[in-house]
Amino acid sequence: MHYINIRMKIRFSIGIMLLTLSTWAQLRINDKAPMQNVEMKSVNGSLYSLSSLKKDKGLIVIFSCNSCPFVVGADDFPGWEKQYDSLYNEALANNIGFVLVNSNEGKRAQADSYEEMIKHAKEQNYTMPYVVDDKAALADAFGARTTPHVYFFDQTFKLIYTGSIDNSWDKGRKSDEPYLFNAIKAQGKGKKIKPNTTEPKGCGIKRVTTTPKN
């Protein structure tokens, strides 16, 4: 019964995500990152901007949280945050910056408060920056849909990959496709990223309003 409930929660999250796909304008490949110099508070107390985190070969931004089964895991899904550390280390090895962004403004008094972010980062041994996106401003500017949702920019802040970390969510997959890991390797070698766009899967970002922004 617990197994069924978890699967129902994940399916419900997918349903909510699909209902909100068209609400926010989406960054597309070759678009430039907005809000490059806006500072956000990290769980270590420091302030970071996208510009300060970008390295010589780019920056990876992953919208994440403390509570979504796609991030933290469930009985039938390990959770993508278990890959964060290895992806972060691979990014560093290829001179690429890396940041986790929590935009769940609608849960700031609950599981995604700043205090809970600090606690979660310690429990999961996060070594990468994990920042608060106040009022989900960055998520809105990016058009971020889900937790997780990946945006990978090159050294000029041009978007070169966006979507999912891999295809492990797909129970019918014929092979494993580590999209983000492959994108990091390709960018590190100066090669073209293929595919450069995949469908993000996860829980919908918990914004405080569903009113579209122009």
Where are these regions (language model features)?
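Loop/turn elements at helix/coil->beta-strand transitions in domains of secreted/extracellular proteins
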Residues: 56-59, 93-98, 125-129, 155-156
